[in-house]
Amino acid sequence: LRLIIESQVDAIIFDEKRLNLAKDVITSKDSNVKYFICMDYNEDSNGILSFSKLLKDGKKLIESNSSKYNSISIDKDKLSVLIYTSGTTNNPKAVMLSQYNICSNVSAMTTLIKYEKDDSILVFLPLHHTLACLASFLFCYYIGFRLCFADSIKDIGKNMVEYKISGLVCVPAVLEIMYRQIIRGVKKSGKYTAFKFLCAFSNFLMFFHIDIRRKLFKQVLDNFGGKMRTIIYGSAATDKKVIHLFNTIGIDMLQGYGL
């Protein structure tokens, strides 16, 4: 409630689970909110608007040749987004961003990431974090990737295989888990010595720009769905040996950061 009042927003969009919070905002004398939009309502009710009804009404306006939406003037440098920090050390602070901040980062990602039309990105980080929102949610919409939401953190591995994920945005803790799974699996198979040799051989070939990493480590990559090519990580320090291993087996690692 404090953040809604502090940010002086005109509208809030919420699901039915947050209905009590919305009612608190409605009764608050300090709130500037004019529009309350519920994702789960099919019809407007008690001053709360239905998201699906708004979409239908907007579609009707466009079909009737209304130009209200397309004629809206956008100032790309104007404050458009407030994203609050986690508040780990103190009260959450609002990070002020413009549309240009957001769009320029999403556009720049296309120059760094190799992508194919049938790629899928796995999402499990909170989308109110700038890195997760930019590198997964908005980037997927910009490029046309399929966006897959993980069932839970413990199901990430299963979801990678199920959805044949080609890209992942995560924190170092997830990388550590994946790293341990790889090492544990190789040792269990009794092929750890051969694996270390292939790692050295792969890096030797890469020195001469010969890239057959995905052929050498196909069995390992199959455990992550077989299509994983890129991982974007951030928010904390990552052990170099973890990054080095993923690069060695054919997964390109990119360090991201929130705006």
Predicted stretch roles:
Residues 38, 59-84, 91, 114-120:
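Conserved pre-ATP/AMP-binding loop-to-beta segment of ANL
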Residues 173, 230, 234-242, 251-259:
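Conserved A3 ("GATE") glycine/threonine-rich loop of ANL adenylate-forming enzymes
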Residues 1-56:
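Structural core segment of the AMP-binding/adenylate-forming
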Residues 80-106:
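Conserved AMP-binding A3 loop
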Residues 12, 79, 85-88, 121, ...:
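Conserved S/T- and glycine-rich ATP-binding loop of Class I adenylate-forming
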Residues 51-52, 77, 100, 125:
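Structural detector for helix-capping/boundary residues
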Residues 103-120, 127-218, 227, 252:
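Conserved AMP-binding/adenylation subdomain of ANL enzymes
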Residues 1, 71, 157, 217-220:
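Short hydrophobic/charged patches on amphipathic alpha-helices used for structural packing
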